[in-house]
Amino acid sequence: MFRRSTLVLGTALALSTAAAYSHHSFAMFDNTKESTIEGEVKDFQWTNPHIWIQVNVKGSDGKVQEYSIEGGSPNGLKRQGWTKKSINAGDKISLKMHPLKDGSPGGSFMSALVNGKTLGRNVAEEYPAAPAAK
């Protein structure tokens, strides 16, 4: 009986280790830098394992560039008060992020001001004039 229990436990541990290692790294983001973009939400994807926000940003030359922003898990964000309707296509957004190291248009979500509501970490410090999200 002991041998069988040990075999079952060993198999379970081996399988759970593979799942833990399958989660990707955030090494592609430069966590020493912060940048802010302003634009219009093209798409908001409330999906596991991470949410994605596509934002169209108009440059000084008038050309629109699409940014892809990776956020936290829907489960974690729901505990912070988010819903799948917190951000919608067409919303005006000011978004703070850690940019991609390679300079591509994208980053890791930090916080945002969306239609007068704040979302994310340390929003009181980053957007002091904005009301807290409900």
What name fits each language-model region?
Residues 8-18:
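Bacterial N-terminal signal peptides
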Residues 37-41:
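Conserved hydrophobic positions within beta-strands
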Residues 100-123:
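OB-fold/S1-family single-stranded nucleic acid-binding modules
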Residues 119-134:
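Extended, charge-rich, solvent-exposed interface segments
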Residues 1-8:
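Bacterial N-terminal signal peptides that target proteins for export
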Residues 79-94:
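Short nucleic-acid-contacting surface segments enriched for D/E, G, S/T with interspersed K/R
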Residues 47-57:
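Short aromatic-glycine-enriched beta-strand elements
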Residues 21-35:
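Short boundary/loop segments of OB/S1/cold-shock single-stranded nucleic-acid-binding domains
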